[in-house]
């Protein structure tokens, strides 16, 4: 059975909590305000924005007191042809020493900042374009479409367009219902560049392309795509003893998007379809004991599976073969309790049993139409 009510409850149980959302929004806003008011960097910082699974609404609830991981991109107007990667990152060290003493560490392509309730990953980037193209891109990166700290799930009508604005009422519904994504020609050909201190070179990255693709895919899948990503991530976490460490994070998310058909009718059917498609699509690659390659949505020369070993891919494939048997049986079962027991084999106790009235029918848990607005605290003051 599809057990839609139970899947809704399951998703509520594995999403980040409202206090966790408050933590990362507070941390991001505080960092942005401090950067905007830090005089030595005022002339080079164009904007800061959230990226990663937090922004794309594909993050799951951290376990065992683990802090949420939040990726924050700092867009600068630095000329990457005139400044070395190490020099660019060094410009931000005095800022970090002033506001985050003994809380930050340098990383290969970013700075890690550990706060009481959140882990921030600060990524320094630059706009490589010049002239009028650069001016137009700076306008986009300064727009509310990019600056919003709301996730795709919270802002369902979000579009990558400098004319898009959220509602002034505080609700997660904007006043821009008829605005569509800006044409690809206006922004996609100009990824950001980021410094790699380990290799001492600049590389290309396009977080906006990943966010926009995710939003578009989620709409095409009736809102189920981001939730199926969460479900698979949770399954992977629950079965970590029997699965390889990789793929995880964005490579796993990308594999799911590659396998999921548009028009997803429900979580149960979507999960079975994407697993079956994954297994059939990569059966030949698996038979060779190899692995596929998949181009990044923003920087096509990047293979998102480049760091995934063939051995780990094959072990993951075998894990999905086992999961497919259970998922198909759970979907086919006409007994609500039996179906729930099978889904729980995949997802653990966060997936609830149906009530006395059974499974696929009206009533029971109803997902809220929009997230609750968390109470404010002074945690990031």
UniProtKB/Swiss-Prot annotation:
Record: residues binding Mg(2+) A: 69, 71, 121
Catalytic activity: GTP + 2 ATP = 3',3',3'-cAAG + 3 diphosphate
Name of encoding gene: cdnD
Binding residues for Mg(2+) C: 196
Residues that hold GTP 1 according to the record: 53, 56, 210
Positions annotated to bind GTP 2: 109, 197, 204-205, 307
Residues at the active site: 69, 71, 121
Name of the protein described by the UniProt record: Probable cyclic AMP-AMP-GMP nucleotide synthase
């Amino acid at each position: 059975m599809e057990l839609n009510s139970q899947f809704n409850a399951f998703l509520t149980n594995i999403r980040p909590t409202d206090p966790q959302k408050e933590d990362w929004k507070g941390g991001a806003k505080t960092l942005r305000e401090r950067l905007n008011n830090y005089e030595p960097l005022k002339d080079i910082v164009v904007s800061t924005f959230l990226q990663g699974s937090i922004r794309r609404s594909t993050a799951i609830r951290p376990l065992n007191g683990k802090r949420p991981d939040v990726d924050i991109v700092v867009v600068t107007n630095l000329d990457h042809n005139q400044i070395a990667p190490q020099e660019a990152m060094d410009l931000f060290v005095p800022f970090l020493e002033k506001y985050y003493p003994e809380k930050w560490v340098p990383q290969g392509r970013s700075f890690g900042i550990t706060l009481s309730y959140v882990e921030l990953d600060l990524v320094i980037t630059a706009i490589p374009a010049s002239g009028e193209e650069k001016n137009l891109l700076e306008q986009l990166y300064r727009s509310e479409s990019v600056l919003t700290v709301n996730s795709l799930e919270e802002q369902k009508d979000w579009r990558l367009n400098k004319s898009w604005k959220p509602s002034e009422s505080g609700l997660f519904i904007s006043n821009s219902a008829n605005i569509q994504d800006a044409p690809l020609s206006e922004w996609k050909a100009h990824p950001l560049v980021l410094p790699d201190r380990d290799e001492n070179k600049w590389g290309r990255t396009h977080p906006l392309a990943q966010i926009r693709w995710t939003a578009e895919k989620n709409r095409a899948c009736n809102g189920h795509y981001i939730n199926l990503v969460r479900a698979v991530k949770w399954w992977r976490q629950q079965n970590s003893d029997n699965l390889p460490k990789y793929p995880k994070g964005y490579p796993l998310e990308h594999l799911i998007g590659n396998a999921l058909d548009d028009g997803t009718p429900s979580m149960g059917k979507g999960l079975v379809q994407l697993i079956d498609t994954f297994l059939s699509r990569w059966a030949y690659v698996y038979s060779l004991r190899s692995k596929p390659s998949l181009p990044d949505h923003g920087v096509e020369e990047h293979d998102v599976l480049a760091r995934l070993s063939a051995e780990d891919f094959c072990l993951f494939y075998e894990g999905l073969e086992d999961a497919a048997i259970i998922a198909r049986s759970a979907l086919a079962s006409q007994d609500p309790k039996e179906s729930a027991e099978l889904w729980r084999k995949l997802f653990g106790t966060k997936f609830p049993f149906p009530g006395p009235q059974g499974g696929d029918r009206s009533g029971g848990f109803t997902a809220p139409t929009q997230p609750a607005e968390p109470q404010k605290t002074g945690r990031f003051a």
